[in-house]
From Swiss-Prot:
<comment type="function">
    <text>Component of the 26S proteasome, a multiprotein complex involved in the ATP-dependent degradation of ubiquitinated proteins. This complex plays a key role in the maintenance of protein homeostasis by removing misfolded or damaged proteins, which could impair cellular functions, and by removing proteins whose functions are no longer required. Therefore, the proteasome participates in numerous cellular processes, including cell cycle progression, apoptosis, or DNA damage repair.</text>
</comment>
<dbReference type="GO" id="GO:0022624">
    <property type="term" value="C:proteasome accessory complex"/>
</dbReference>
<dbReference type="GO" id="GO:0005654">
    <property type="term" value="C:nucleoplasm"/>
</dbReference>
<comment type="similarity">
    <text>Belongs to the AAA ATPase family.</text>
</comment>
<dbReference type="GO" id="GO:0043161">
    <property type="term" value="P:proteasome-mediated ubiquitin-dependent protein catabolic process"/>
</dbReference>
<dbReference type="InterPro" id="IPR032501">
    <property type="entry name" value="Prot_ATP_ID_OB_2nd"/>
</dbReference>
<dbReference type="InterPro" id="IPR003960">
    <property type="entry name" value="ATPase_AAA_CS"/>
</dbReference>
<dbReference type="Pfam" id="PF17862">
    <property type="entry name" value="AAA_lid_3"/>
</dbReference>
<keyword id="KW-0067">ATP-binding</keyword>
<feature type="modified residue" description="Phosphoserine">
    <location>
        <position position="244"/>
    </location>
</feature>
<feature type="modified residue" description="N6-acetyllysine">
    <location>
        <position position="72"/>
    </location>
</feature>
<dbReference type="InterPro" id="IPR003593">
    <property type="entry name" value="AAA+_ATPase"/>
</dbReference>
<dbReference type="GO" id="GO:0005829">
    <property type="term" value="C:cytosol"/>
</dbReference>
<dbReference type="GO" id="GO:0005524">
    <property type="term" value="F:ATP binding"/>
</dbReference>
<dbReference type="GO" id="GO:0016887">
    <property type="term" value="F:ATP hydrolysis activity"/>
</dbReference>
<keyword id="KW-0963">Cytoplasm</keyword>
<dbReference type="InterPro" id="IPR041569">
    <property type="entry name" value="AAA_lid_3"/>
</dbReference>
Length: 389
């Protein structure tokens, strides 16, 4: 009796294993079927898109009733048209770009605002991965900048509790090479927000009204992509003091400045758009640009003192391959009047001296030679007296 029973048990185990194996294969096949169904649907949608007729780009002028809108097509004429049921009609405000059906001219979908290629390029400027620890000797300036730019974007409720309006922007001013652009890059890389880097001289256009239009589009883009930081470098290119005499080119720059002033403090508020401006010549800027309400805080970034120079030198010398003890304090004592860029140049020159000596490392003597060489070239520079603004 035992043999048939054992045989039956063995058959049962065998069938059970086969069942598990088939069940596993069935699950795999179901996953494959799911994936293939997705691919099929995507291919079908792509095929429909290829076969479908194109659409006309238009602009909403006015809403007549709940279902009817006046739109202007790009080819000129105006039409009273309907709208797809699935669309949120509250978004169809005057000025909204929409796609119209070729035959019925029904509003099929809304389109994003048209962006100038220059503004689009500004938004794709990568600030890089810069941390505050990489900036030496500017702890007070970093604190002031973060209070104005970072705090209103990350903790706006603090300002609501106290009952004050958050600052709109700040001006970074000081001698060249002191880290103004680096500070702005650090703020942008530490915050999860959009960043527009604008070189002010690139805004100026030879055609009347084009520069002001670019400023408008830049601020419209920033408002559509909040939170956003606009960093305008070398603001003295368009923010110079206004005067009555001048050529037509000067008047065009003044019109650009007036558009900038209007966008910064006009009827249309900036909300979560923050401004950082940088310049080497604060004395040439227009008083209307500097007033509170536009640039609420002016941060002076002066030449670093001895302790700050020591911090900066250690940061720049960190990645360098060194041999033996390096006396940073002795190097810093010879670097009176140096800015951050000069101290980085000292490290580069020290590396060049090591390469010239056919070494794979830098020694103390290389740094001493480099700091003397940079000090000699500094004598050629002219100095500006930076008064507080």
């Amino acid at each position: 009796m035992a043999d048939p029973r054992d045989k039956a048990l063995q058959d049962y185990r065998k069938k059970l294993l086969e069942h598990k194996e088939i069940d596993g294969r069935l699950k795999e096949l179901r996953e494959q079927l799911k994936e293939l169904t997705k691919q099929y649907e995507k291919s079908e949608n792509d095929l429909k898109a290829l076969q479908s007729v194109g659409q006309i780009v238009g602009e909403v002028l006015k809403q007549l009733t709940e279902e009817k809108f006046i739109v202007k097509a790009t080819n000129g004429p105006r039409y009273v048209v309907g709208c797809r049921r699935q669309l949120d009609k509250s978004k169809l405000k005057p000025g909204t770009r929409v796609a119209l059906d070729m035959t019925t001219l029904t509003i099929m979908r809304y389109l994003p605002r048209e962006v100038d290629p220059l503004v689009y390029n500004m938004s794709h400027e990568d600030p890089g991965n810069v941390s505050y620890s990489e900036i030496g000797g500017l702890s007070e300036q970093i604190r002031e900048l973060r209070e104005v730019i970072e705090l209103p974007l990350t903790n706006p409720e603090l300002f609501q509790r106290v009952g004050i309006i958050p600052p709109k922007g700040c001006l970074l001013y000081g001698p060249p090479g002191t880290g103004k652009t680096l500070l702005a890059r650090a703020v942008a890389s530490q915050l999860d927000c959009n960043f527009l880097k604008v070189v002010s001289s690139s805004i100026v256009d030879k055609y009347i009204g084009e520069s002001a239009r670019l400023i408008r589009e830049m601020f419209n883009y920033a408002r559509d992509h909040q939170p956003c930081i606009i960093f305008m470098d070398e603001i003295d290119a368009i923010g110079g003091r206004r005067f009555s005499e001048g050529t037509s080119a000067d008047r065009e720059i003044q019109r650009t400045l007036m558009e900038l002033l209007n966008q910064m403090d006009g009827f249309d508020t900036l909300h979560r758009v923050k401004m950082i401006m940088a310049t080497n010549r604060p004395d040439t800027l227009d008083p209307a640009l500097l007033r509170p309400g536009r640039l609420d805080r002016k941060i002076h970034i002066d030449l670093p003192n001895e302790q700050a120079r020591l911090d900066i030198l250690k940061i720049h010398a960190g990645p360098i391959t060194k041999h033996g003890e390096i006396d940073y304090e002795a190097i810093v004592k010879l670097s009176d009047g140096f800015n951050g860029a000069d101290l980085r140049n000292v490290c580069t020159e020290a590396g060049m001296f090591a390469i010239r000596a056919d070494h794979d490392f830098v020694v103390q003597e290389d740094f001493m030679k480099a700091v003397r060489k940079v000090a000699d070239s500094k004598k050629l520079e002219s100095k500006l007296d930076y008064k507080p603004v």
